[in-house]
Amino acid sequence: MKALLFAAALTASTASMAEELRIFNWLEYIPDEVIQQFEEEYDAKVIYDTYDAAEKMETQMLTGASGYDLVFPGSSNLGRLIDSGALEKVDTSKLTNIGNIEPEFMQILRDIGDKDNQYAVPYLWGTNIIGYNQARVKAATGKDALTSWDDIFSVESMKALEQCGVAMMDSPTEIMPLILFHLGLDPYSTKAADYKKAEEFMAELRPYIRYFNSSQFVEDLANGEICAVIGWSGSLFIAQSIAKGTNNGNDIRMVMPEEGTMVWFDNMAIPKGAPHKELAEKFINFILRPEVIAIASNSIGYANPNSKATPLVNKEIKSNPAMYIPEEDMKKLFAQESLSLRTEKIRTRAWTNIKTNR
């Protein structure tokens, strides 16, 4: 009996000694299978906290002493976090799998603020595109497909689509650049006048938009509650998968508008003063394994920048031109960028005015 009690106590003690890795990330953005595999292999315990807006993560990082070991900043705020000193340099000498990342993605990181590739490692990437219910859109508009930003950003189209429901993500970071792009303006303009033009343009469309929400649209599109949405490519893939999986009769399609769109990147980074920096670097290197990042792509529905992982990604994902963009369409993409805090305030104010139609 004493031996059994001693063994039980030893097991409990060993479990309690497992090193903790505190991650701050989007909800369900790392598959449980991946986390469990890492915990078992490295005798670690992952604490996974979530946020529902990139702005919340950024605010948390800028306050300092967050207590987190790993965060996932996007291309919209990575530059500001680096400039503010909120991130630690990653010891790339410990990332034996870093060579799996396609060079063009490392170049994009340099272009958006990580000039020497010292602070961030690419995780997943995607685009902001149009998702729609083919039958309901045809019934409302007479069109077989939505192919252009004109199919969303025009009063005529929105009036027709209002009857079946149009939604947009609730994020100035994700939608405002698309509005400016459609208007022929710099998607990352620093001019207050350009954001005023966007406000005035959207004032005509606002009455026909059912809601702004960055998560509700997935279920609603899948179930036929709405018929069109501007959303993240991976979220639209999930909506499509739900509709197919439940066999509910909704033919959900996703398309990159013919004019082009914004491409974004979520990255792995280590907060300043992270308690377990070395374990965070082990996790980053673990994610860079082709077989691991492929699990993430197959589960979450987003493309990854790991060239060796592509053969392991499900065919329905890697053959989808709205997710793994064909080379000839890549030139139509513009990368998501950071804005100065001053311009970010202007953009956010304009977005609030659009939503409230003031």
Which residues make up each language-model segment?
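A ligand-binding cleft/hinge motif common to bilobed small-molecule-binding domains
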Residues: 77-80, 228-249
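Conserved C-terminal helix/tail region of periplasmic/extracytoplasmic solute-binding proteins
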Residues: 219, 327-358
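N-terminal signal peptide c-region/cleavage motif recognized by signal peptidases
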Residues: 13-16
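Extracytoplasmic ligand-binding site segments that recognize negatively charged/polar headgroups
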Residues: 78, 82-208, 220-222
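A bilobed periplasmic-binding-protein/Venus flytrap-type ligand-binding module shared by bacterial periplasmic
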Residues: 131-136, 181-184, 264-276, 295
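Mature extracytoplasmic/periplasmic domains
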Residues: 271-332
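Early extracytoplasmic/lumenal segment of secretory-pathway proteins
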Residues: 19-81
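Periplasmic-binding protein-like
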Residues: 195-204, 210, 248-269
